[in-house]
Amino acid sequence: MTLTKETRVTLNDGNMMPILGLGTYAAPDVPKSLAEEAVKTAIDVGYRHIDCAFITGNEMHIGNGIRSKISDGTVKREDIFYTGKLWCTYFSPDMVRKGLERSLRDVGMDYLDLFLMHWPVSLKPSGASDPSDKDKPFIYDNVDLCATWEALEARKDAGLVRSLGVSNFNRRQLERILNKPGLKYKPVCNQVECHVYLNQNKLHSYCKSKDIVLVTYSVLGSHRDRNWVDLSLPVLLDDPILNKIAAKYNRTSAEVAMRFILQKGIVVLAKSFTPARIKQNLGVFEFELKPEDMKTLESLDRNLHYGPFREVKQHPEYPFHDEY
């Protein structure tokens, strides 16, 4: 199938997700206004899939960017596929609605196209919220993931969410949701870190067998925010083999890294706040990697997580103790 910026995948609930989206995470020291301008640029050049999260603290700015492009007639609300995420401190069933409504309010929308459980680890709101919060520790909670899922299903029934999914779940955790008695809605996707150094082949195969779309963040090897990433890890885009293949196609290493994942049938979220790069990333639809180059890139897998969220490694639901 020829891939274009208009290509969408059909989710198991019948809704459609664009195969390329704009990731909007930014380190705390990055001005929030840049997110708003990035969204405007992305929509202007053809992106229709915008991914955000409560924990990034910029949903209000993302929403401003989207609404400005709706106001000027560039797009209609129904043209945009917007993803939000329920943070781990809102997993208690009685908190799910509050978490969703906060995101809806901040982004200025009546509904979200997709809402994800951000990580499978529940945290108490009295503790730290994310790794940048150095003043207090994380306090683990023991909320049943299935109970959170049931509360999310109720929000979908209420019309506040079009599709439901998960993020950073392993196979065992997905199976618990899928095997839940009385399940109303399957997760439509599992959003995970995935790139040349972490190809996620086993998890991808499992998700495909269950009609769950794999969506990838950190496709370029992650940002270099020391709150989340070990800065001693190798820089993916500097990989000599990746760069050799990029030169062969007269493309950037970033374009090849993204095209590799797209050709595997995985939805890509490309994070950039630089207008030129946002536009350049659409170049992934202008070429196709040959089978031998796909095979070479597959061989670079190191099972390397740039963002393993080690601060919650002792949580009983920490996902990366399992093989996949």
Swiss-Prot record:
Q: Does the keyword DNA damage apply?
A: no
Q: Which InterPro entries match?
A: AKR, AKR1C, Aldo/ket_reductase_CS, NADP_OxRdtase_dom, NADP_OxRdtase_dom_sf
Annotated residues for binding of NADP(+): 218-281
A molecular function annotated in GO for this UniProt entry is: structural constituent of eye lens
The record's annotation in Pfam families points to: Aldo_ket_red
Q: Which UniProt keywords apply?
A: Acetylation, Eye lens protein
**UniProt subunit comment:** Monomer.
Protein name (database record)? Rho crystallin
- Species, as recorded: Aquarana catesbeiana (American bullfrog)
Q: What is the lineage of its organism?
A: Eukaryota, Metazoa, Chordata, Craniata, Vertebrata
